Amino acid sequence: MALKSLVVLPLLVLVLLLVRVQPSLGKESAAAKFERQHMDSGNSPSSSSNYCNLMMCCRKMTQGKCKPVNTFVHESLADVKAVCSQKKVTCKNGQTNCYQSKSTMRITDCRETGSSKYPNCAYKTTQVEKHIIVACGGKPSVPVHFDASV
């Protein structure tokens, strides 16, 4: 009986720990989500009008619904992370953790077209060079949200 409780108690503790930790195991961090949704460093902006249709799909922004607007940044991750130590500005939602890039960056804006309807999401692709504004968080401070381009 004593041996049985010696085995059961540690197993119970292990199960409780796994149940508590499990929900966070598959959860994407805000920084990882920012990179998935907004970074396209390895590529110069494509001149293809189909760029947004392909990227929005392969970056999982058309699952369950069409994300109406998204911006891809075509600069190095290091350059985008550096924005978190540049000009501090107020975010669109009033928070104070946004930063504006010192220099313009190559970006592609993707906007859902009027004919777009889930599951056939359709986007207009527009390439521009603008300053980006990102919300930063964590230690070290890294981009966690794309706020705007100006």
Swiss-Prot record:
Highest taxon of source: Eukaryota
Note: Progressive deamidation of Asn-93 transforms the homodimer (beta- 2) into and heterodimer (alpha-beta) and finally a doubly deamidated dimer (alpha-2).
Tissue specificity comment: Seminal plasma. Can reach 3% of the protein content of this fluid.
Pfam families linked: RnaseA
Listed GO MF terms: identical protein binding; lyase activity; nucleic acid binding; ribonuclease A activity; RNA nuclease activity
Chain positions recorded as substrate binding sites: K33, R36, K67, P68, V69, N70, T71, K92, R111
Source taxonomy: Eukaryota, Metazoa, Chordata, Craniata, Vertebrata
Subcellular location field: Secreted
Entry protein name: Seminal ribonuclease
Activity regulation text: Allosteric regulation by both substrate and reaction products.
UniProt keyword Hydrolase present: yes
Modified residues (Deamidated asparagine): N93
Organism expressing this protein natively: Bos taurus (Bovine)
Alphabetical GO biological process terms: defense response to Gram-positive bacterium
Chemical reaction(s) catalysed: an [RNA] containing cytidine + H2O = an [RNA]-3'-cytidine-3'-phosphate + a 5'-hydroxy-ribonucleotide-3'-[RNA]; an [RNA] containing uridine + H2O = an [RNA]-3'-uridine-3'-phosphate + a 5'-hydroxy-ribonucleotide-3'-[RNA]
Residues that span the membrane, as ranges: none
